Amino acid sequence: MNTYKNSLNHFLNLVDCLEKIPNVGKKSAFKMAYHLGLENPYLALKITHALENALENLKTCSSCNALSESEVCEICSDESRQNSQLCMVLHPRDVFILEDLKDFLGRYYVLNSIEEVDFNALEKRLIEENIKEIIFAFPPTLANDSLMLYIEDKLQRFHLTFTKIAQGVPTGVNFENIDSVSLSRAFNSRIKA
């Protein structure tokens, strides 16, 4: 016997796809699918177009690995930013969060994963940009502490100052779950790593 739900394959497929977005549960996915499919199909078309454009144009900056729509991102090509400081973050989304604070005027380097770090290119960048300080803007975890020590060891011959953002950022919490005041305070109170 066919049920009503079985006859709505396309709608249920949309719900299933939306549910795969982080932090979106089945009820929220259903509400979004219903809204986009029935109440506001124009918005659905706008979202589709925006997704196509983003997928077609987004790439990573060849210098810092942040999101960009060109070979080199706006931050790396901005001559007015301080070259002496390089802020290392784990994910491209962390650059968005820190930039919103407007507390850091230096450059960034997005790690993504330690396996992907091109230390030769990073070392070249340290020399060319005359970087004096590396700021680790990582959420505090034992794994991230180990990562900082590893990077410090790999770059010790450059006699850099290594700092990390101060505690106050709860252990095990991602940046997007921290209020901007706490994150700003932690960033401005960074300590030697």
Swiss-Prot record:
Pfam families, alphabetized: RecR_HhH (PF21176), RecR_ZnF (PF02132)
PROSITE patterns: RECR, TOPRIM
Entry keyword Metal-binding: yes
Disulphide-bonded residues: none
Signal sequence coordinates: none
Protein's job: May play a role in DNA repair. It seems to be involved in an RecBC-independent recombinational process of DNA repair. It may act with RecF and RecO.
Protein name per Swiss-Prot or TrEMBL: Recombination protein RecR
